[in-house]
Each structure stands twice: as C-alpha cells, then as structure tokens.
C-alpha cells in the first residue's frame, strides 16, 4: 500500500475494524500518525464495521469474554486479561481496578489505590486523571460528554461522593459533586449543592451508573430547593451511551 495515494489509503483504513487498527499502529509510522488525526477518527467511527466487546471485572482485572448463545447450553469463555499501561509501574498487572464505567467505547476505571484512568481497550490508549484528594469513600463516577454541534465531543466525568459520621444515628452525611473537563484537564466543584437534601445512608450506596439518570435525579431533588444549582446542572447537556 506504500505506492497508493494517501487519500486512498485513508479510505481503505477507515473501513478496518478498531481491533485490527490496533495491530496496524506499529506497522507504519505514517499510518500511526493518520490514526491520531481527528478527521480520520470521525470517518472511521461512521464507516468502520461496528464491533462488540464483552468485558467483565474479575479479581481487580478487566477480562475479555466470548459468549456463544447459539449452543445449548450457552457457553462463556474467558479470553484473557486486558492490561492497562501505567507509566509509574513497569508491570502491567499491578493496576488493580475496583470499578468500571462505560461511555462511547471508553472505560473509566477507578483503581484500588484511589486513582482514575480513562482507557480505550481497542487502541490500548490511556489517560490518567489526578484526583484532588484521596477520599473515595462512597464515591460514584459517571463518564459522558457534552454534545456541541460547533466542536467535537467534550468528555466529562461526574464525581459524587460523601462521608459519614458512624457515631451519629441516621446521619445524612456530607456530599460533594465535582465535574472533570477533559479539555481543561481540571476539576470543578459544585459548591452550592445543599448537604441536607439527600436520602439517608442506605439509599446513598445505590450506584447511579448513567449520567442522565444521575442528573435527572438531581433535577428532581434540587428543583424546588436550590434553583441556582438546578440551573447549573440543567445546562450541562450531558449525553451517555
């Protein structure tokens, strides 16, 4: 393919599946540069054949699975563990994952040592995100994006966490909501969320996996009690896939 025009090469590669592109990245530097272009990513997203990947969190590792529903009984086969690149560790197996959130083919992983990483398992790319503190007790995360027609998707993370006083019966605890913006690489605290408007401890441990569910819940909770916070959340325009 080295003799083909670059636009024709791009047209051919844009029809290759994502898992195959991962193997091609080390084949040619010119191709690897092409894969990083925004225009190619958008074209590949719309043209390439869609693939499904079944993943399972097992013993702090993300494992790929093969599920066959066409046999009786249906079979489930573990295909192996997917390693996450971590520049601070030489061994890929040292990254222990406790929670995984999904959006648009990306995985948001919370590690056992209180770190966050956004991971593209098809391409093997990672982005480590610094938390401003190490207090993750009762933390819940959600990964989504702001859909703006004038620019590409701006991915964001919603963090919802709290702490409790064990010696106080029926204590509602204290809570914080933070939003991480990928473009600015920064966290923003929603500091006007009232502490006294949340359900008791037994309801807090419910996991709100989807941004739309999380934000809708906040709408209903805060609409009549804190109009300013309600408006701020309402205009985030989240999407979750």
From Swiss-Prot:
Ranges in a coiled coil: none
Disulphide bridges, residue numbers: none
What superkingdom does the record give? Answer: Eukaryota
The record ties this protein, via PROSITE patterns, to: FBOX
Q: Residues in domain F-box?
A: 1-44
A Pfam family: F-box
Supply the InterPro entries for this chain. F-box-assoc_interact_dom, F-box-like_dom_sf, F-box_dom, SCF_F-box_component
Protein name in UniProt: F-box protein At3g22350
- Record lineage: Eukaryota, Viridiplantae, Streptophyta, Embryophyta, Tracheophyta
């Amino acid at each position: 393919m080295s003799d083909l025009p670059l636009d024709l090469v791009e047209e051919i590669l844009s029809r290759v599946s994502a898992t195959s592109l991962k193997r091609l990245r080390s084949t040619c530097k010119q191709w690897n540069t092409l894969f990083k272009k925004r225009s190619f990513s958008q074209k590949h997203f719309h043209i390439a054949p869609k693939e499904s990947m079944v993943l399972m969190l097992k013993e702090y590792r993300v494992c790929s699975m093969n599920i066959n529903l066409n046999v009786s009984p249906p079979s489930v086969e573990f295909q192996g563990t997917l390693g996450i690149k971590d520049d601070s560790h030489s061994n890929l197996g040292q990254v222990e994952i406790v929670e995984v959130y999904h959006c648009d083919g990306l995985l948001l992983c919370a590690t056992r040592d209180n770190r966050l990483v956004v991971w593209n398992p098809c391409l093997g790319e990672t982005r480590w995100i610094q938390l401003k503190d190490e207090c993750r007790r009762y933390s819940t995360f959600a990964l989504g994006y702001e859909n703006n027609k004038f620019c590409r998707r701006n991915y964001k993370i919603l963090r919802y966490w709290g702490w409790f006083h064990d010696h106080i019966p029926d204590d509602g605890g204290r809570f914080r909501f933070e939003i991480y913006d990928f473009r600015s690489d920064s966290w923003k605290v929603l500091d006007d969320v009232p502490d006294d408007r949340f359900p008791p401890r037994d309801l807090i441990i419910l996991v709100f996996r989807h941004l739309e569910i999380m934000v809708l819940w906040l709408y209903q909770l805060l609409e009549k009690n804190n109009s300013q916070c309600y408006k701020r959340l309402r205009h985030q325009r989240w999407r979750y896939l």
